[in-house]
Amino acid sequence: MNSNEMYRKKFEEMLKVEEKAANLYKYYISELEDPTLLEKFKEIYEDENKHIKIVKDFIERTE
């Protein structure tokens, strides 16, 4: 496998993860009215917010 193929596969994997994350975000938004889940969502938000900042920085560097 050459480098192009390797990176194509890696980016395809990353895309799948981001698509799944988008679906989870939609679920979290729809469930925010449930107070029993709020604390868990806060934890998830903190973790995901760190990830989003990294992705935004990456996008800005490559544009």
Q: What spans do the regions from the language model cover?
A:
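Non-heme di-metal
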Residues: 1-63
